Amino acid sequence: MIFDKDDFKAYDADLWNAIAKEEERQQNNIELIASENVVSKAVMAAQGSILTNKYAEGYPGRRYYGGTDVVDVVETLAIERAKEIFGAKFANVQPHSGSQANCAAYMSLIEPGDTVMGMDLASGGHLTHGAPVSFSGQTYNFVSYSVDPETELLDFDAILKQAQEVKPKLIVAGASAYSQIIDFSKFREIADAVGAKLMVDMAHIAGLVAAGLHPSPVPYAHITTTTTHKTLRGPRGGLILTNDEELAKKINSAIFPGIQGGPLXHVVAAKAVSFKEVLDPAFKEYAANVIKNSKAMADVFLQDPDFRIISGGTENHLFLVDVTKVVENGKVAQNLLDEVNITLNKNSIPYESLSPFKTSGIRIGAAAITARGFGEEESRKVAELIIKTLKNSENEAVLEEVRSAVKELTDAFLLYED
């Protein structure tokens, strides 16, 4: 809008070429990282807008700087749209990330040193749910709950028993690698039974919740956090929701001046655009297709005895696959697939025996390929290509066949139409 592509290329060819290479990579790769997606041109336009110039510490109507009338309109649009999407009374759209949203939620609910229960990383939790290397594990006394070792599903009886023993002040629900439906009402029952608050991190499933395809945590959680990317298809950022006015005040204070200064007004604008897209009926169709494509890929793996899907299948946008019968570990699988232009990540599985740098599994997500237009047929083909690659890792002729098949798919489904 202000600085066009030709100007950019002429001014900084090195940076322009790097960005162009990334655009080429995204166009020519099949993206299966579950936390990634493809945003609209409108989202990118908003994020690259002149709003990046404006500082606006505070909140709409209560800023510390002048000249904020326009950014007040922008932020209010984002807030009201977020509230409408999720049926929440209060929304804070300023968090720069999901991790910062979680940090602010903790600050609003508990004190340093308090006992908290969160899902352990290998069972599908997130670093900010109490991992020792995270601020969460270093600030609070986290006690991890796990999935059932046999079913690899959440065991609410076991979680209740554990909660009765450790008496947490807060229970954190939500996951970054759990492929089944989460019953948030049961988590609230457990929290109430032990006098704890409930916080839900729905970062991965927020788009499915928004589309009505996964139960919403908002009626049950004291605070709900999410990212605005992943299945929501917005810019990288965070969002906090609550129905409690007093908690809303604490959340606002925790974000600013607690852990952030001025909001990124251009990112808030991009969030507002993406929220408008979520409110469009077409988004529900997109989210439904994400689940269909995830199931289609999982079904291919379920038919091959050399692979094992954690928990036996998927009901959302992702699933985990134990690859150790075919290759040494998840890291090896990730690297092999990189060579044929299929991008995903190694991932720990429940009761993991390998280090987080190797892992027994890989995580596969359908959000980005669905955004490109892949359907169930293409998704099954992708799963077949993954299996073909991992089972023929030493056969360059087969790997070249896979590369050609990947190129056919990416050429047929462009990242962006010109």
Curated annotation (Swiss-Prot):
Show the InterPro entries listed in the entry.
PyrdxlP-dep_Trfase (IPR015424), PyrdxlP-dep_Trfase_major (IPR015421), PyrdxlP-dep_Trfase_small (IPR015422), Ser_HO-MeTrfase (IPR001085), Ser_HO-MeTrfase-like (IPR049943), Ser_HO-MeTrfase_PLP_BS (IPR019798), SHMT-like_dom (IPR039429)
| Enzymatic reactions | (6R)-5,10-methylene-5,6,7,8-tetrahydrofolate + glycine + H2O = (6S)-5,6,7,8-tetrahydrofolate + L-serine
Report keywords, A-Z: Amino-acid biosynthesis, Cytoplasm, One-carbon metabolism, Pyridoxal phosphate, Transferase
| Cofactor(s) of this protein | pyridoxal 5'-phosphate
Q: What does the UniProt entry say about where the protein is found?
A: Cytoplasm
**GO CC field:** cytosol
Which coarse location class describes where this protein primarily resides?
A: cytoplasm
Q: At what residues does the UniProt record annotate the site feature described as Plays an important role in substrate specificity? A: H229
Q: Which residues carry this modification: N6-(pyridoxal phosphate)lysine?
A: K230
The biological pathway it contributes to is: One-carbon metabolism; tetrahydrofolate interconversion; Amino-acid biosynthesis; glycine biosynthesis; glycine from L-serine: step 1/1
What's the subunit arrangement here?
Answer: Homodimer.
Known function: Catalyzes the reversible interconversion of serine and glycine with tetrahydrofolate (THF) serving as the one-carbon carrier. This reaction serves as the major source of one-carbon groups required for the biosynthesis of purines, thymidylate, methionine, and other important biomolecules. Also exhibits THF-independent aldolase activity toward beta-hydroxyamino acids, producing glycine and aldehydes, via a retro-aldol mechanism.
Family as reported in the entry's similarity comment: Belongs to the SHMT family.
Q: Do you know which HAMAP family this protein is assigned to? A: SHMT (MF_00051)
* Protein's name according to its UniProt entry: Serine hydroxymethyltransferase
Q: Can you name the source organism?
A: Streptococcus pneumoniae serotype 19F (strain G54)
